């Protein structure tokens, strides 16, 4: 949509929600709402609870900017509701959102498209592990959580049992993944075009929830100090992943880089927009202010039928 058209519509920023990432979503949503207000849009903030359909109807929303993270916001649920309500929205559609939120489905899609990803096995609550368990160390993850919630790095059977117990506190489906030692990098993709690569260097050694959202806990190298050929290959791979999943608007693709290559870890279809978030940092590196980034994402709002 054009800027002039959007400035005549009622825009809702959907934030908060019901997931374990609620607090991060509120920070993302507030930052987006303030940016849109500065740019002259009519903005309503909506805390997306179970009464979201009623809130949308009551406020007369015409366009939705989705600033939700985690379940019921990033997994296709809200996207489906907005499709039913005929309200254009930002970001990826129902299927891409659902695929990217499910780490197991994402891994299978990456394998299908020949995109390198760490070896893995899958476990459902009360069942045996499906697939061959990679060698230790391993990373144990709830399949449908974000912000590193419920993740453990394990080195033996005892730690694996504890890691599975923690992961099952958050999900009935768990991904057990080969641990890749290397440099963690992230590539933002905006409307199908890659942004500069950021290398993530957490001071604690592991990029956990605290490192992500506490200022000063992580060093960000922008642009990532990588050989030119590798840098270009990572950007190309990020776009391939974006297209394979079927993403729209803005997304972020995370990789581990080793001496022998790189591996795709996961895809984030609603990247954070807080003061420590990576997508705004990458956009700023190419001269795009936070407000301009928010407007660019808003301009892509549509129905994904």
Swiss-Prot record:
TM spans (from-to): none
Lineage: superkingdom: Bacteria
Enzyme type, top EC level: ligase
Residues annotated for ATP binding in this entry: 134-186
One Pfam family of this chain: Dala_Dala_lig_C
Positions that bind Mg(2+) 1: 254, 266
Pathway: Cell wall biogenesis; peptidoglycan biosynthesis
Swiss-Prot/TrEMBL cofactor(s): Mg(2+); Mn(2+)
Cofactor remark: Binds 2 magnesium or manganese ions per subunit.
Domain ATP-grasp residue range list: 107-299
EC number: 6.3.2.4
Any Gene Ontology CC annotation: cytoplasm
Catalytic activity, reaction form: 2 D-alanine + ATP = D-alanyl-D-alanine + ADP + phosphate + H(+)
Cellular location(s): Cytoplasm
Keywords assigned by UniProt, alphabetized: ATP-binding, Cell shape, Cell wall biogenesis/degradation, Cytoplasm, Ligase, Magnesium, Manganese, Metal-binding, Nucleotide-binding, Peptidoglycan synthesis
UniProt-recorded Gene Ontology molecular function terms: ATP binding; D-alanine-D-alanine ligase activity; metal ion binding
One GO process term, biological-process aspect: cell wall organization
InterPro entries hit by this protein: ATP-grasp, ATP_grasp_subdomain_1, D-Ala_lig_Van_CS, D_ala_D_ala, Dala_Dala_lig_C, Dala_Dala_lig_N, PreATP-grasp_dom_sf
Family: Belongs to the D-alanine--D-alanine ligase family.
Function in brief: Cell wall formation.
Protein name: D-alanine--D-alanine ligase
């Amino acid at each position: 949509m054009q800027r002039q058209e959007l400035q005549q519509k009622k825009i809702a920023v959907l934030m908060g929600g019901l997931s374990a990432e609620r607090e991060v979503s509120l920070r993302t949503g507030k930052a987006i709402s303030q940016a849109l207000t500065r740019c002259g849009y009519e903005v309503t903030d909506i805390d997306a609870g179970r009464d979201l359909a009623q809130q949308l109807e009551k406020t007369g929303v015409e366009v939705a900017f989705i600033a939700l993270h985690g379940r019921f916001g990033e997994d296709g649920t809200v996207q489906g509701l907005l499709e039913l309500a005929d309200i254009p929205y930002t970001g990826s559609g129902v299927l891409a959102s659902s695929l990217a939120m499910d780490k197991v489905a994402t891994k299978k899609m990456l394998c299908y498209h020949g995109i390198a990803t760490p070896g893995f096995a899958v476990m459902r609550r009360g069942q045996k592990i499906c697939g061959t368990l990679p060698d230790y160390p391993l990373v144990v993850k709830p399949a449908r959580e974000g912000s590193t919630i419920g993740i453990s790095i394990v080195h033996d059977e005892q730690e694996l049992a504890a890691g599975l117990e923690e992961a099952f506190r958050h999900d009935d489906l768990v991904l057990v993944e080969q641990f890749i030692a290397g440099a963690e990098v992230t590539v933002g993709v905006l409307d199908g075009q890659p942004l500069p690569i950021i290398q993530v260097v957490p001071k604690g050694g592991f990029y956990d929830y605290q490192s992500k959202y506490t200022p000063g806990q992580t060093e960000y190298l922008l642009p990532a100090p990588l050989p030119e050929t590798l840098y270009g290959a990572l950007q190309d791979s990020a776009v391939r992943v974006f297209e394979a999943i079927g993403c729209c608007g803005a997304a972020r693709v995370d990789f581990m880089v080793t001496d022998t290559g790189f591996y795709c870890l996961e895809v984030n279809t609603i990247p954070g927009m807080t003061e420590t978030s990576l997508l705004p940092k990458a956009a700023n590196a190419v001269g795009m202010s936070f407000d301009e980034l928010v407007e660019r994402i808003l301009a892509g709002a549509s129905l994904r039928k």
